[in-house]
């Protein structure tokens, strides 16, 4: 046989062999498919030890194969001084505000809702809330109007201010209606704070650059303030409604007065005074309820309490009353600060923990660790000073203000020693006994 004929025969043999292998593989694949159809599971899963599924039908097969998306677990926290946890939001809460009449707490979250909670339910098992929906957006900041008949929010995507009116229904609930038009867009950087003067004369918005805007209630910009602080970290309207303050990269807090005429017309914004004494950037500040005290917290590791009841027009500067130290959590967001209405207690939030200080002695009295699953976004005392509220995940947590009750005991004991009038002594003794009984019920009465 010639060499060429032998080569042709060998090639034919190889071709036939390949065809045979392909046929065998096809038969094997068909057998595997048949096995999968009979069992309802892939054959490889049988080999790995999964029991055969005796159920039939494509619906159950799809349910088995569908990957379920697990919801993030709610952070659990317990403490003997925890008064309540408000948990109706399905998204992270970024801001909250107590109404001036003390009846409500407003919260906003990235779940496109604002919740209005009844404060009288705080110590009940059930915590009722009313819901206002934010169409096609969500609110990052919320503030009640002075008359508690409306609230304003800052829209995350719209970058503007929206007003919601609250209309009371016959059943005692409220209907929430957004005004037809939002405020015009004016800020060029993200807005970090908003506020309304309790006089009802102006609204304040502050962005993370150096801009603070003063608005009329109708959405007209009355004044633009350049804080010259490199960047703003916090801004607020004083409870008295006269002042606007800001802090930022510089080691001071700047305060302006928003001036109006006798007929209520806007006149000007003038520099009032500054809080000077920190050696590094100021994270945050807060006013007491009467605006006569302010507190500040800085990157330098200190907090300070100030007497701001001064005649600034006569060039009188605020007085430093107390300086305290704190340890800032490593890698945490800038500290949040809240001052009790009577300025006797200062609360600092660093990371997910809260520290409470007696401002007269400068001593830390309480510490709540890992309160939220994320860094605390907002911190606030209610207007009575009974509770401290915090938010940082999908819940608001409310704490009994035991340092406030202890400060009340110390104050009443001091007044009793100096009181000469019997009726005054009886009134002071009644307040002292009430504060002591509250501490005793909370297991926080010091012997």
Curated annotation (Swiss-Prot):
One of its GO terms (biological process) is cellular response to glucose starvation. Disulfide bonds: none annotated. Coiled coil: none annotated. One of its GO terms (molecular function) is protein kinase binding. WD repeats lie at residues 88-127, 134-174, 186-226, 228-267, 277-316, 329-367, 371-409. The keyword Isomerase does not apply. Keywords: Isopeptide bond, Phosphoprotein, Repeat, Ubl conjugation, WD repeat, Williams-Beuren syndrome. The keyword NAD does not apply. The modification Phosphothreonine is found at residue 433. There is a cross-link at residue 168 (Glycyl lysine isopeptide (Lys-Gly) (interchain with G-Cter in SUMO2)). Residues 38-72 are annotated as: Disordered. InterPro entries: G-protein_beta_WD-40_rep, WBSCR13, WD40/YVTN_repeat-like_dom_sf, WD40_repeat_dom_sf, WD40_rpt. SMART domains: WD40. Residues 57-69 have a biased composition (Basic residues). Transmembrane segments: none annotated. One of its GO terms (cellular component) is endoplasmic reticulum membrane. It is linked to TBL2 is located in the Williams-Beuren syndrome (WBS) critical region. WBS results from a hemizygous deletion of several genes on chromosome 7q11.23, thought to arise as a consequence of unequal crossing over between highly homologous low-copy repeat sequences flanking the deleted region. Haploinsufficiency of TBL2 may be the cause of certain cardiovascular and musculo-skeletal abnormalities observed in the disease. PANTHER family: TRANSDUCIN BETA-LIKE PROTEIN 2. This is Transducin beta-like protein 2. The gene is TBL2.
């Amino acid at each position: 046989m010639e060499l060429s004929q032998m080569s042709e025969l060998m090639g034919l043999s190889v071709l036939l062999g390949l065809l045979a292998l392909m046929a065998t593989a096809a038969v094997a694949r068909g057998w595997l498919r048949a096995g999968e159809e009979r069992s309802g599971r892939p054959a490889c899963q049988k080999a790995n030890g999964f029991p055969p599924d005796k159920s039939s039908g494509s619906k159950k097969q799809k349910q088995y194969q569908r990957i379920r998306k697990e919801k993030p677990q709610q952070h659990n926290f317990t403490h003997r001084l925890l008064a309540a946890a408000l948990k109706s939001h399905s998204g992270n809460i970024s801001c909250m505000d107590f109404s001036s009449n003390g009846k409500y707490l407003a919260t906003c979250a990235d779940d496109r809702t604002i919740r209005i909670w009844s404060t009288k339910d705080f110590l009940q098992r059930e915590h009722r809330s009313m819901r206002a929906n934010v169409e096609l957006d969500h609110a990052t900041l919320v503030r009640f109007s002075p008359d508690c008949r409306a609230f304003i929010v800052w829209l995350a995507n719209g970058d503007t201010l929206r007003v919601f009116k609250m209309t009371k229904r016959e059943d005692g609930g409220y209907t929430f209606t957004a005004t037809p038009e939002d405020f015009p867009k004016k800020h060029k950087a993200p807005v970090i704070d908003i506020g309304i003067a309790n006089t009802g004369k102006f609204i304040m918005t502050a962005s993370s650059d150096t801009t603070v805007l003063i608005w009329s209630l109708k959405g007209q910009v009355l004044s633009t303030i350049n804080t010259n602080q490199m960047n703003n970290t916090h801004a607020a309207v004083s409870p008295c409604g006269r002042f606007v303050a800001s802090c930022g990269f510089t080691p001071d807090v700047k305060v302006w007065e928003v001036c109006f005429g006798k007929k209520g017309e806007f006149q000007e914004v003038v520099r009032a005074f500054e809080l000077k004494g920190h050696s590094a950037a100021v994270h945050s500040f807060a006013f007491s309820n009467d605006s006569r005290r302010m507190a500040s917290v800085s990157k330098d590791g200190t907090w300070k309490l100030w007497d701001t009841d001064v005649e600034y027009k006569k060039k009188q500067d605020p007085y430093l009353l107390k300086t305290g130290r704190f340890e800032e959590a490593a890698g945490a967001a800038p500290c949040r600060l809240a001052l009790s209405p009577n300025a006797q207690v200062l609360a600092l939030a660093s990371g997910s923990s809260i520290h409470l200080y007696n401002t007269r002695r400068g001593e830390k009295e309480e510490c709540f660790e890992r309160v939220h699953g994320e860094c605390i976004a907002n911190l606030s005392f209610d207007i009575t000073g009974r509770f401290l509220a915090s938010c940082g995940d999908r819940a608001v947590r409310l704490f009994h203000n035991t340092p406030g009750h202890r400060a009340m005991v110390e104050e009443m004991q001091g007044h009793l020693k100096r009181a000469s009038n019997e009726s005054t002594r009886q009134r002071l003794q009644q307040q002292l006994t009430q504060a002591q009984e509250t501490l005793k019920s909370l297991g926080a009465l010091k012997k």
